[in-house]
Amino acid sequence: MKLSELKTSGHPLTLLCSFLYFDVSFMIWVMLGALGVYISQDFGLSPFEKGLVVAVPILSGSVFRIILGILTDRIGPKKTAVIGMLVTMIPLLWGTFGGRSLTELYAIGILLGVAGASFAVALPMASRWYPPHLQGLAMGIAGAGNSGTLFATLFGPRLAEQFGWHIVMGIALIPLLIVFILFVSMAKDSPAQPSPQPLKSYLHVFGQKETWFFCLLYSVTFGGFVGLSSFLSIFFVDQYQLSKIHAGDFVTLCVAAGSFFRPVGGLISDRVGGTKVLSVLFVIVALCMAGVSSLPSLSMVIVLLFVGMMGLGMGNGAVFQLVPQRFRKEIGMVTGIVGAAGGIGGFFLPNILGSLKQMTGTYAIGFITFSCIALLAFALVLAAGYYWRKSWSAESSPADV
């Protein structure tokens, strides 16, 4: 497989637009997490409330992913993406000119979930342009849009320090409008777009064991990635007494590892199979989170989180190398379901960390809990991988799995 095949086997401009749409949407989706230290200071939030505020957009994004996944299969990804970006402008405007109460903040967080649902649109849009042997790479490139978190964590605190967090939400409208114009102008739906089917025809995917295995795996990889991305600023400030800006810088470094290594996870999975890659990555993540639970020095915890986030990011790419091998026709719907599971995992992780900190007075218990969850995922991959390689259709060779 050569990278040049991406140019000849698909539509590079659509792949680029899918990445940009997901990138700017992801930046907006985690905005409350990037600004969480400022928001918690304004509202005087408890550790539990801090976790809840940054987790609300992640949970609502899970619900919206299913909705946008269905729309992607029925009206096409381009129209769905346009609708999603228009709706995303509402909470940004609300946060700029409102957001003066905790109730408003929760409502804004719910609407920001539409930005997180972009995942269920961008990945199928890219996937449908490319053949099976390029799925991991194409999906990994589009999925690398989760690097939008970098912009939120790097620039959000700096801008909030100068102008306040409300203005930062208004500033986020600028890149969204730019991407909106580029997307409308250049993105195209694949001619391989399946014809719309009755809604009931999609229900059978809920009865497939593979759907729920993918959900479990992605709730750990993506849930871990986005959950930590949203919560680490608070962790660094609370545990290591860093300034808000320095905390954001370290979060950016860790997020970069997960974001830019996602395509690598997809690329390696194309060559050796997604289950083999995941089995290694879950062990790495478990070891890193166990190390973080000891609350070592700042330099050591950054190394552990960097490697752990890299493993989670590669795991995201590996999971979505597997999805098209099993669900080619229903990829929009399945992407929405699996993406929703990832969002649910991302909702629970900040709440686990915040709640256990409030209950025990330490973050150690929360991180060791996440380490145990990663080990459970490792066991699931080992159990499922052999069965998948034997039972999936001839369209996917054992090496693809």
UniProtKB/Swiss-Prot annotation:
Its main location: membrane. Coiled coil: none annotated. Induction: Positively regulated by TnrA under nitrogen-limited conditions. Keywords: Cell membrane, Membrane, Nitrate assimilation, Transmembrane, Transmembrane helix, Transport. It comes from the Bacteria. GO terms for biological process: nitrate assimilation. One of its GO terms (molecular function) is nitrite transmembrane transporter activity. It is a multi-pass membrane protein. The chain crosses the membrane at residues 19-39, 51-71, 79-99, 105-125, 136-156, 167-187, 217-237, 277-297, 300-320, 333-353, 364-384. GO terms for cellular component: plasma membrane. The keyword Cell membrane applies. It is found in: Cell membrane. May function as a nitrate transporter. Belongs to the major facilitator superfamily. Nitrate/nitrite porter (TC 2.A.1.8) family. This is Nitrate transporter. It comes from Bacillus subtilis (strain 168). The gene is nasA.
